[in-house]
């Protein structure tokens, strides 16, 4: 029996246990051994993480797909797991050590510290997994993976070694994003651009051979910088080759102020003649653009900072090279000072000597570490790199050929732009937590790359014996006793970028490099669901690695979902205080309400503006479903075994069968094409409007009437349609539907494993494709041979739809006019059907009691034409008239509507004035501009509705 009130908290934990006990989500269930496989890999959340709204959206959409395909009979693997999250995890544990006043990471040493990290992971690393379960994620939790599991670590080592052997991994000195607090290189994704009110310092660089005079512009070139401290590392001044002001100076030199270094004036298109003086200082070791200019002109790379962001020039051979003796004194003065302290010293000294032309206030974006919060430095250092350009070519070709497609398609352009301009990928990090790079160094710096230490040591010792650096006896002793080779062979201390192991996720989680049955069955996966912000960092790299090591794309479809913003459209952030916690929403409204909200708002390419009122609204929808099922139960609605909905005799029941089949088709096609919002809308509209508001309402007289064939059939149809509803809603609202499935009738099993509504199995098109593959591919596995029967044609009953649809449309139109004209419910209005066809007359007679009750209509009459003073409604091509003379004061109603029209027009004018203001559009926050657009659209819609009402009044009077 169904409880009187719907309380999600009472059912969610119980339903979760039922799924777990039945191993409902386990891939490779015995009864699905021959089913068509369907697989998705979860974007692994950080092991340090907790569920945020982005996770909630991403995993809700994946779960909709997995539950949908599982109900269609497929063998579904939704592969779960977590990422070791190098920096984040190391910081969490270091913070814990500090809070507990324990020895620091460095005092503890690497081995002991890593033990503590693993201990923390065991104690606290499963938080987000449990939160995903609360959301209802139907992953195969028995297969949960971690990016530092033994098997995945072996895959990482093998990939590194293979790519190194192929010349696609190498060591190089290049610029990286350097975090002076965490003392490591970080990825672009870990860099946050923050708007800062700073300055632009305009500096005078004296031209060699001329006497410097601040009053004589011909004696110097002006350059501008936001980072004056980096001038210590300048190695050129660049001007545009087309800039006639400087043509005569190209090839000459300037003398770097304070430093005394002689640096060339080079011609390069990087310099923009329209910006500032048109000349720019070039610091190859401290600016990414300057680094490229430096390569083009073979300029020296002079690093003037140490790893902590302090000036390092006193013993810096690159800095000191070629400097006059007198200039070295300044190096001693400034050496060891913090970069921002040095900035003040340098600016003051430049001003003292007349080298500072002006200081200009300047608001600009400054890169900060998203975890450390400090300003990031472009820093020249030795790191390990992947030749991403070579690996990118097959990945570009796969998307160009359509082997992998993006949904929405416009994201392919973003993918191509990045891939076609891809830079070497820095994969080393100066951390302790992560996959330690499998490279060992000999005493002369020679590198030995191998999957295991044993192999690397063997290779190294063999090499040095051959080179006669050590004897065979020494080599034997070193091989046997690690202590004897200490200092002779040392391992690279760096670890790999977290994204390196994540790039292998689609195949490493399936057992690669071993040739496992799971790898053969579930790779490639069917779709990747992810956010646009990691197209470069994760999607592109999985494409590269999948094609290189598996010789196949990791997924044929990439679905890119949008951002979840606050209700005004602003990006959620802790600093703004507008972060909405999904767990709080689950506690208050239930997981199903949150899931349905996210799905209903997940229109392709459009960010979600999340308001708690929407979640509350869908909680009400869940309550509506609950109450509809209680109504069916209280009226004894049960579908007997073998019930055939297509054999229904009653027009109303044939209509609901027609509408149910249509709703199933709409939901199915929308999910298949990743139109989650359309699928949710179709389900919502059918359940609330068609089934609850109309079918159950129209069926009440039968259900409450005398026993007979009509009542028996209606009870069965109410139950059948209810079950179809539970099926199409299950991917969106799994908890409530599973509960109602269990309590509404005796069942053979869980709804999660029940067959999908009518269109069971897979699409007709897919059936034909699989059949063709099975017929032509001798290697086709059992899954390929499990071809479902072709689908039967959709059930339709156009006559039933025409009849009941007319009743619904007529009542809806009358209700709309009554509301529009403020007619009180107690006032019954007459209805005249003007020039009605014989079919319409017959329908009106059959359904007169229903029309009168639901539309608050008194007498229903028929006439050749609409009477004077009647509001005319067009219902399915025929006129229905409401004689309202004496019921409505037409003049007063017209005055009211005209007043409303004036307000709507004023709102339109106000919004359009703002949107026409270029300064407003350019400077206001994106969400504020979008809000004005929405105000305009709402006012325009209101105006159209009022004009329609005025036209009706005019025609009536």
Curated annotation (Swiss-Prot):
<dbReference type="GO" id="GO:0005524">
    <property type="term" value="F:ATP binding"/>
</dbReference>
<feature type="binding site">
    <location>
        <position position="574"/>
    </location>
    <ligand>
        <name>ATP</name>
    </ligand>
</feature>
<keyword id="KW-0175">Coiled coil</keyword>
<dbReference type="GO" id="GO:0004832">
    <property type="term" value="F:valine-tRNA ligase activity"/>
</dbReference>
<keyword id="KW-0067">ATP-binding</keyword>
<dbReference type="InterPro" id="IPR013155">
    <property type="entry name" value="M/V/L/I-tRNA-synth_anticd-bd"/>
</dbReference>
<comment type="similarity">
    <text>Belongs to the class-I aminoacyl-tRNA synthetase family. ValS type 1 subfamily.</text>
</comment>
<keyword id="KW-0547">Nucleotide-binding</keyword>
<dbReference type="InterPro" id="IPR033705">
    <property type="entry name" value="Anticodon_Ia_Val"/>
</dbReference>
<dbReference type="Pfam" id="PF00133">
    <property type="entry name" value="tRNA-synt_1"/>
</dbReference>
<dbReference type="InterPro" id="IPR014729">
    <property type="entry name" value="Rossmann-like_a/b/a_fold"/>
</dbReference>
<protein>
    <recommendedName>
        <fullName>Valine--tRNA ligase</fullName>
        <ecNumber>6.1.1.9</ecNumber>
    </recommendedName>
</protein>
<dbReference type="InterPro" id="IPR009008">
    <property type="entry name" value="Val/Leu/Ile-tRNA-synth_edit"/>
</dbReference>
<dbReference type="InterPro" id="IPR009080">
    <property type="entry name" value="tRNAsynth_Ia_anticodon-bd"/>
</dbReference>
<comment type="subunit">
    <text>Monomer.</text>
</comment>
<dbReference type="GO" id="GO:0006438">
    <property type="term" value="P:valyl-tRNA aminoacylation"/>
</dbReference>
<keyword id="KW-0436">Ligase</keyword>
<feature type="short sequence motif" description="'KMSKS' region">
    <location>
        <begin position="571"/>
        <end position="575"/>
    </location>
</feature>
<dbReference type="InterPro" id="IPR001412">
    <property type="entry name" value="aa-tRNA-synth_I_CS"/>
</dbReference>
<feature type="short sequence motif" description="'HIGH' region">
    <location>
        <begin position="45"/>
        <end position="55"/>
    </location>
</feature>
<dbReference type="InterPro" id="IPR037118">
    <property type="entry name" value="Val-tRNA_synth_C_sf"/>
</dbReference>
<dbReference type="InterPro" id="IPR019499">
    <property type="entry name" value="Val-tRNA_synth_tRNA-bd"/>
</dbReference>
<dbReference type="GO" id="GO:0005829">
    <property type="term" value="C:cytosol"/>
</dbReference>
<dbReference type="InterPro" id="IPR002300">
    <property type="entry name" value="aa-tRNA-synth_Ia"/>
</dbReference>
<keyword id="KW-0648">Protein biosynthesis</keyword>
<dbReference type="Pfam" id="PF08264">
    <property type="entry name" value="Anticodon_1"/>
</dbReference>
<keyword id="KW-0030">Aminoacyl-tRNA synthetase</keyword>
<keyword id="KW-0963">Cytoplasm</keyword>
<comment type="function">
    <text>Catalyzes the attachment of valine to tRNA(Val). As ValRS can inadvertently accommodate and process structurally similar amino acids such as threonine, to avoid such errors, it has a 'posttransfer' editing activity that hydrolyzes mischarged Thr-tRNA(Val) in a tRNA-dependent manner.</text>
</comment>
<dbReference type="InterPro" id="IPR010978">
    <property type="entry name" value="tRNA-bd_arm"/>
</dbReference>
<dbReference type="GO" id="GO:0002161">
    <property type="term" value="F:aminoacyl-tRNA deacylase activity"/>
</dbReference>
<feature type="coiled-coil region">
    <location>
        <begin position="887"/>
        <end position="946"/>
    </location>
</feature>
<dbReference type="Pfam" id="PF10458">
    <property type="entry name" value="Val_tRNA-synt_C"/>
</dbReference>
<dbReference type="InterPro" id="IPR002303">
    <property type="entry name" value="Valyl-tRNA_ligase"/>
</dbReference>
């Amino acid at each position: 029996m169904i409880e009187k009130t719907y309380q999600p908290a009472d059912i969610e934990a119980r339903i979760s246990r039922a799924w777990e006990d039945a191993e409902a989500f386990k891939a490779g269930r015995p009864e699905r051994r021959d089913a068509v496989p369907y697989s998705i890999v979860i974007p692994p959340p950080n092991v340090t993480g907790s569920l945020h709204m982005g996770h909630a959206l991403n995993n809700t959409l994946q779960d909709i797909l997995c539950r949908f395909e599982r109900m269609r009979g497929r063998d579904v693997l939704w592969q779960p797991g977590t990422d070791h999250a190098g920096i984040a995890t190391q910081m969490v544990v270091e913070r814990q050590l500090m809070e507990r006043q324990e020895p620091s990471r460095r005092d503890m040493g690497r081995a002991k510290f890593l033990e503590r990290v693993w201990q923390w992971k065991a104690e606290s690393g499963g938080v987000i997994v449990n939160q995903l379960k609360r959301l209802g994620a139907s992953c195969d939790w028995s297969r949960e993976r971690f990016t530092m599991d033994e098997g995945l670590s072996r895959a990482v080592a093998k990939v590194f070694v293979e790519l190194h052997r192929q010349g696609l991994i190498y060591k190089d000195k290049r610029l990286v994003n350097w975090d002076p607090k965490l003392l490591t290189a970080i990825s672009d994704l870990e860099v946050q651009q923050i708007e800062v009110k700073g300055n632009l310092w305009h500096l005078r660089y004296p031209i060699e051979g001329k006497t410097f005079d601040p009053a004589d512009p011909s004696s110097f070139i002006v350059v501008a910088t936001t980072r004056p401290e980096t001038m210590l590392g300048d190695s050129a001044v660049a001007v545009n080759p087309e800039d006639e002001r400087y043509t005569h100076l190209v090839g000459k030199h300037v003398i770097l102020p304070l430093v005394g270094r002689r640096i060339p004036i080079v011609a390069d298109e990087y310099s923009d003649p329209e910006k500032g003086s048109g000349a720019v200082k070039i610091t190859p070791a401290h600016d990414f653009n300057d680094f490229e200019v430096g390569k083009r002109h073979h300029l020296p790379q002079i690093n003037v900072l140490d790893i902590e962001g302090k000036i390092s020039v006193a013993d810096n051979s690159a800095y000191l090279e070629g400097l006059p003796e007198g200039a070295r004194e300044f190096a001693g003065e400034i050496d060891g000072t913090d970069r921002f302290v040095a900035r003040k010293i340098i600016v003051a000294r430049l001003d003292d000597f007349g080298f500072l032309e002006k200081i200009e206030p300047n608001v600009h974006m400054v890169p900060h570490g998203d975890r450390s919060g400090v300003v990031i430095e472009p820093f020249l250092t030795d790191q390990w790199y992947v030749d991403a350009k070579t690996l990118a070519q097959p990945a570009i070709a796969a998307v160009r050929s359509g082997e992998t497609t993006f949904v929405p398609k416009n994201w392919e352009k973003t993918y191509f732009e990045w891939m076609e301009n891809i830079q070497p990928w820095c994969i080393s990090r100066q951390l302790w937590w992560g996959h330690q790079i499998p490279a060992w160094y000999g005493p002369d710096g020679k590198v030995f790359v191998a999957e295991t230490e044993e192999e690397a040591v063997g290779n190294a010792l063999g090499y040095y014996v051959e080179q006669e650096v050590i004897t065979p006896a020494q080599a034997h002793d070193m091989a046997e006793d690690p202590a004897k080779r200490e200092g002779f062979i040392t391992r690279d201390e760096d670890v790999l970028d977290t994204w390196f192991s994540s790039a292998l996720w689609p195949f490493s989680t399936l057992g690669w490099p071993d040739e496992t049955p799971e790898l053969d069955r579930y790779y490639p996966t069917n779709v990747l669901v992810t956010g646009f912000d990691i197209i470069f960092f994760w999607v592109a790299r999985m494409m590269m690695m999948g094609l290189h090591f598996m010789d196949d794309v990791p997924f044929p479809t990439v679905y890119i979902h949008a951002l979840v913003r606050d209700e005004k459209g602003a990006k959620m952030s802790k600093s703004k205080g507008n972060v909405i916690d999904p767990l709080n929403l689950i506690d208050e409204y239930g997981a199903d309400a949150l899931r349905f909200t996210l799905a209903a708002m997940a229109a392709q390419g459009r960010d979600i503006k999340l308001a708690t009122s929407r979640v509350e609204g869908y909680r009400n929808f869940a309550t509506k479903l609950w109450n509809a099922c209680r109504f069916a139960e209280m009226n004894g609605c049960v579908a007997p075994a073998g019930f055939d909905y297509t054999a229904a005799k009653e027009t109303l029941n044939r209509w609901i069968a027609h509408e149910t089949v249509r709703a199933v088709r709409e939901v199915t096609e929308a999910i298949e094409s990743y139109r989650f919002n359309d699928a949710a809308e179709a389900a919502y509209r059918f359940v609330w409007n068609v089934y609850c508001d109309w079918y159950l309402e129209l069926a009440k007289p039968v259900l409450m009437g005398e026993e007979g064939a009509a009542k028996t059939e209606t009870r069965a149809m109410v139950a059948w349609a209810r079950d179809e509803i539970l099926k199409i809603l299950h991917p969106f609202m799994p908890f409530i539907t599973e509960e109602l499935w269990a309590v509404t009738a005796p069942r053979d099993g869980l709804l999660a494993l029940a067959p999908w509504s009518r269109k069971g199995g897979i699409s007709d098109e897919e059936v034909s494709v699989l059949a063709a593959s099975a017929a032509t591919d001798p290697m086709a596995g059992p899954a390929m041979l499990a071809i479902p029967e072709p689908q039967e044609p959709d059930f339709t009953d156009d006559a039933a739809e025409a009849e009941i649809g007319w009743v619904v449309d007529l009542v809806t139109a009358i209700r709309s006019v009554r509301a529009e004209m403020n007619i009180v419910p107690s006032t019954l209005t007459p209805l005249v059907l003007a020039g009605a066809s014989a079919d319409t007359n017959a329908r009106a007679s059959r359904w007169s009691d229903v029309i009168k009750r639901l539309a608050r209509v008194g007498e229903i009459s028929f006439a050749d034409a609409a009477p004077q003073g009647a509001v005319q409604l067009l219902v399915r091509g025929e006129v229905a008239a409401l004689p309202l003379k004496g019921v409505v004061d037409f003049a007063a109603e017209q005055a009211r509507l005209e007043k409303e029209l004036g307000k709507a027009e004023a709102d339109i004018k106000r919004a359009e004035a703002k949107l026409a203001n270029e300064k407003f559009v350019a400077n206001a926050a994106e969400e504020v501009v979008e809000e004005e657009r929405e105000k305009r659209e709402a006012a325009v819609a209101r105006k159209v509705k009022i004009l329609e009402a005025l036209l009706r009044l005019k025609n009536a009077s």
